[in-house]
Amino acid sequence: MSIENLKAALPEYAKDLKLNLGSISRTTVLDEEQLWGTLLASAAATRNAQVLAEIGAEAADNLSAQAYQAALGAVSIMGMNNVFYRGRGFLEGQYDDLRAGLRMNIIANPGVDKANFELWSFAVSSVNGCSHCVVAHEHTLREAGVGREAVFEALKAAAIVCGVAQALTAAQTLAAVG
């Protein structure tokens, strides 16, 4: 199971994604933990079993057990937070004075470098389409000294993984009915 398997599974019309996936997996902008945590978290956020299985297997070879769990923790907490903050944003400030009352302890104690956890949360929030969370995580990353290039590379990784998941879902669905 690997990035190579995903590239091989992509249909011809997704050739750009195949090339982008190969490029992003060799990035020098992100360190290994940042890259593989971002890829794993983004894969889980796509909800595509094949993408998660393939990237998850390769991520396990490139991340410590603690980082692997933290990346999945970022997906879990952002699954809740992205819905909550995106929904609250739709309400145009009418509920901003109310306390969320949601437990988010993993954000304070992720078990890995907090900037890496923020990077993964930023990527997942991008996949999930929560503009409030994307902006908040980007701000935290920049305050922590993470460069614009690294933030942008994580965004590209999330976008590529999301595109791969959509292409594979389309191909699998059409193959099943065709």
Curated annotation (Swiss-Prot):
Subunit structure of this chain's protein: Homotrimer.
Species of the source: Mycobacterium ulcerans (strain Agy99)
Signal peptide segment: none
Annotated Gene3D superfamilies: AhpD-like
Domain of life: Bacteria
Disulphide bond pairs: C130-C133
Keyword Disulfide bond: yes
HAMAP family in the record: AhpD
Active site: C130 (proton donor), C133 (cysteine sulfenic acid (-soh) intermediate)
Catalytic activity: N(6)-[(R)-dihydrolipoyl]-L-lysyl-[lipoyl-carrier protein] + a hydroperoxide = N(6)-[(R)-lipoyl]-L-lysyl-[lipoyl-carrier protein] + an alcohol + H2O
The protein's role, per its UniProt record: Antioxidant protein with alkyl hydroperoxidase activity. Required for the reduction of the AhpC active site cysteine residues and for the regeneration of the AhpC enzyme activity.
Gene Ontology molecular functions: alkyl hydroperoxide reductase activity; disulfide oxidoreductase activity; hydroperoxide reductase activity; peroxiredoxin activity
Gene behind this protein: ahpD
EC number: 1.11.1.28
Keywords from the UniProt entry: Antioxidant, Disulfide bond, Oxidoreductase, Peroxidase, Redox-active center
Protein name (record): Alkyl hydroperoxide reductase AhpD
One GO term of the biological process aspect: cell redox homeostasis
Keyword Disulfide bond: yes
Protein family membership: Belongs to the AhpD family.
